[in-house]
Amino acid sequence: CSSDLPQIEVVQIQFNYADFDDPAVQAGKCYEICRKHGKQVIVMEPVRGGSLANLPDDAKAVFEELHGGSPATYAIRYAAGFPGIMMVLSGMSSLEQMKENVSFMKDFRPLDEREMKAVEKVREIFRGKNLIPCTGCRYCVDGCPKKISIPDLFACMNAKKIYQNTNSNVYYRVHTRNNGKASDCIKCGKCE
């Protein structure tokens, strides 16, 4: 099947356990398409911009029970453990983080069944955070008189609920720079 697209040798995708079945990112589906076409995959965002390293306490406790490394370790090993992954790009901001990443990638082993169950438990915790259900289809955006990028703002709110960090504030500012803010909504109902 790789002969279908001979000009493409490798594909780089955002791939991590939080985005695997996320309707906006669709990391799992992107990965499956790469594999269907026989393409090697380079992973970016295995720790989702640091969000999967700084988990809420209930999610962090799941990995702590395993006694096998930091949340970032599990996130990177999750991404690296899939067939066809040729490289995992992980941003690091300290020498300590680099040493940690090198230590478990040097003698790499994919997540075992117990660890995969822990990842799924963390994903269940994320899903239980009373998130705004949005597929990111963007149908609601077309009729908005205030040009509010509704799915992007929902994604920011969901990220804030899950990860409790300020990255979502940065993305909110990015998405509202040339579009309406949530507070600009006039409740016209065209998005319904």
Predicted segments, located by residue:
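Short Fe-S-cluster ligation motifs
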Residues: 162-190
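Beta/alpha (TIM)-barrel catalytic core signal, keyed to glycine-rich beta->alpha loops juxtaposed to Asp/Glu
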Residues: 1-135, 139-148, 152-155, 167, ...
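Short, intrinsically disordered, charge-balanced linker/junction segments flanking boundaries
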Residues: 1-2, 188-192
